[in-house]
């Protein structure tokens, strides 16, 4: 699957027209926040299978259209959605990566899945979640009744890389106590395009350039850095994981980026051991976004994912 040399042409001529066949739909989540989702449905299928894609912080459905395209052409119906406060969903605070309650992320996800899965009798349901989406999906899989057969967690947000963990967590807690939860965390601010060369997301300049173009052409989906409340709530959710993870009984594949600089891989390794049925695969020569990497890396990741999903456990 070689796309990089002609990615721009592929995206404009094939990917976007494909994705636009499936309109954005909306439903109301907790506190009446409007949630955006797309359901990519096969025209005819005797046996239907569903792939649920759960994106990460500051991401959006349009960014995930390439992966949706790939799974759709493997015969899946595909569900994508944007979390509250980002993408095409309603913002809690304009421009800022803010959150009211972490559990609302999980409740929103459950409501969207329930709505879509009521439309068809799916013989198989698979889930692929990335980073913050993997943290949310972990809570969903542990605490909600569901019919997901297997799940892939890509670079799960199971820990934050903090230079001074005790001091930094104290500052985060204090800022929330002092009523400063809606402020950007120190060092973060309004949306900026990612640097093609010096970024912590991917080695693939081609896909990063395309992501920047998406945000430039669709400024409404731009999102700045996280607030103190967002970080505080996510840290609390991470701390509760040792009690949450053991509840998940389905097979789990965890994708760990070798060159990770965003999430804490050491904490990930400790938590992976708590899953009843999980294995971790280290993706060589990959930064945080393993599914948006260079063609050769991405191809191998998808090969591993498909093997995991299609081989009987």
UniProtKB/Swiss-Prot annotation:
Transmembrane segments: none annotated. One of its GO terms (biological process) is lipid metabolic process. It comes from the Bacteria. Keywords: Cell inner membrane, Cell membrane, Hydrolase, Lipid biosynthesis, Lipid metabolism, Membrane. Gene3D superfamilies: alpha/beta hydrolase. It catalyses: a 1-acyl-sn-glycero-3-phosphocholine + H2O = sn-glycerol 3-phosphocholine + a fatty acid + H(+). It is found in: Cell inner membrane. GO terms for cellular component: membrane; plasma membrane. Its EC number is 3.1.1.5. One of its GO terms (molecular function) is lysophospholipase activity. Its main location: membrane. This is Probable lysophospholipase L2. The lineage of its organism: Bacteria, Pseudomonadati, Pseudomonadota, Gammaproteobacteria, Pasteurellales.
